[in-house]
């Protein structure tokens, strides 16, 4: 019994110990475990809820993605259709451009080919025509017939309105023209009573005075300046030239300084002009006018053909005496020249200023012809004209210009046929060579 009680007490003590110290921790552990299970269950429930929400959101996202994908697909299809249409339009436009450009290129190539064919054919035609013409005009009778045909055409021309002038008055203003007219009038009265020797002296003296005025600008200014009282200028002339020049020269100089000149240089022009007239009147008195005119025109053509000689004779840097020496050398090399023509050319070279030598000599030649009341026609032909052709040409030109015309003929075989006529500033070109040249010029490039 005692054992049983002892065991019971021991059991009770064990129970007490268990209840006191073992059960509470175990109970606490169990509560904690339960709480942990509860929390785990709550978390599980929350996780399940979140999972459900996530599934819902996923489903929604999928739907949204499908909708967006459908929209993008639709827009892409629309863009692709639009791009396709644009590319098609661009392709059509580019095709049209290439087509038009190709057509234009074809047209340009066609035109170029046509031009080349025309140019080649035209050149060959002109060349063949030139050969035919040259063969034709190789016969003197045929060549003469081309001149006759041109004279027929010239005969039908209306009267020309050309105004033909010559001499120093060409570039003078009104006051100087009037002054020159008075001086020439005085010269005519002096020349009536002068013999050829007096005219030669007069020409030499006037030429010397012109050279002096040309080198002394101050003297020229005093003698040419306009003034109401010319007595002072006359006294100056007498002091300078008294006893050094003849009376005729002094009278002409007094008349010259008494006039009103537009510019100072016109006085020199007038004195030179009268010096030329003195020599031309001398040529008339001695019956050498035509010879002088012909030699002047011939020398003018020489200067036209030799530009370097023309430049040297007019070069102001070269002293006048050296230019005159060159002139005499050229004249002597040509077999000599009429003394009056030589004197006229010497005057011109000594006093040349501001003009080319060929122009100055041509003006001198025209003055020589104009002295006889004629105009000068410079005619270029392929061969010499017959007397009948020359006479007819003179008559036709005289009728056209309303004044007697003097013919100066130059033979140039390159003219081929017809005539090239220059009267003053007017040119009548009826040469075959110019017509062939015009045909070449008219060919397409």
From Swiss-Prot:
GO terms for molecular function: proton-transporting ATP synthase activity, rotational mechanism. Signal peptide: none annotated. Keywords: ATP synthesis, Cell membrane, CF(0), Hydrogen ion transport, Ion transport, Membrane, Multifunctional enzyme, Transmembrane, Transmembrane helix, Transport. The keyword Secreted does not apply. It is a single-pass membrane protein. It is found in: Cell membrane. Gene3D superfamilies: N-terminal domain of the delta subunit of the F1F0-ATP synthase. PANTHER family: ATP SYNTHASE DELTA CHAIN. This is ATP synthase subunit b-delta. It comes from Mycolicibacterium vanbaalenii (strain DSM 7251 / JCM 13017 / BCRC 16820 / KCTC 9966 / NRRL B-24157 / PYR-1).
């Amino acid at each position: 019994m005692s054992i049983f009680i002892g065991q019971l007490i021991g059991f009770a003590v064990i129970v007490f110990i268990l209840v006191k110290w073992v059960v509470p921790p175990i109970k606490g552990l169990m509560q904690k475990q339960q709480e942990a299970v509860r929390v785990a269950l709550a978390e599980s429930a929350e996780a399940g809820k979140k999972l459900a929400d996530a599934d819902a959101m996923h489903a929604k996202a999928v739907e949204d993605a499908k909708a967006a994908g459908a929209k993008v697909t639709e827009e892409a299809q629309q863009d692709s259709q639009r791009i396709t249409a644009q590319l098609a339009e661009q392709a059509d436009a580019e095709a049209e451009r290439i087509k038009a450009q190709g057509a234009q290129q074809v047209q340009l190539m066609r035109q170029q080919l046509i031009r080349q064919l025309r140019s080649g054919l035209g050149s060959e035609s002109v060349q063949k025509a030139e050969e035919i013409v040259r063969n034709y005009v190789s016969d003197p009778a045929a060549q003469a017939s081309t001149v006759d045909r041109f004279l027929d055409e010239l005969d039908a021309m209306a009267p020309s309105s050309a105004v033909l002038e010559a001499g120093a008055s060409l570039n003078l203003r009104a006051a100087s023209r009037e002054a020159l007219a008075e001086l020439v009038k005085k010269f005519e009265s002096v020349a009536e009573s002068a013999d050829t020797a007096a005219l030669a002296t007069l020409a030499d003296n006037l030429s010397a005075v012109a050279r002096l005025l040309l080198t002394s600008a101050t003297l020229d200014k005093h003698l040419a300046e306009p003034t109401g009282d010319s007595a002072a200028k006359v006294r100056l002339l007498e002091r300078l030239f008294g006893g050094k020049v003849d009376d005729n020269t002094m009278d002409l100089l007094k008349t010259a300084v008494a006039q009103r000149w537009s510019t100072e240089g016109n006085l020199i022009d007038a004195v030179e002009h009268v010096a030329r007239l003195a020599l031309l009147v001398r040529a008339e008195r001695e019956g050498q006018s035509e010879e002088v005119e012909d030699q002047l025109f011939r020398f003018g053509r020489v200067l036209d053909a030799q530009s370097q000689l023309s430049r040297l004779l007019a070069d102001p840097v070269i002293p006048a005496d050296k230019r005159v020496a060159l002139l005499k050398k050229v004249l002597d090399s040509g077999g000599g020249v009429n003394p009056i023509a030589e004197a006229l050319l010497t005057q011109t070279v000594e006093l040349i200023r501001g003009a080319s030598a060929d122009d100055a000599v041509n003006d001198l030649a025209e003055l020589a012809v104009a002295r006889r009341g004629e105009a000068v026609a410079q005619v270029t032909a392929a061969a010499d004209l017959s007397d009948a052709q020359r006479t007819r040409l003179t008559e036709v030109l005289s009728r056209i210009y309303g004044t007697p015309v003097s013919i100066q003929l130059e033979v140039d075989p390159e003219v081929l046929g017809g005539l090239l006529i220059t009267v003053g500033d007017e040119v009548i070109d009826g040469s075959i060579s110019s017509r062939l040249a015009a045909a070449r010029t008219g060919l397409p490039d």
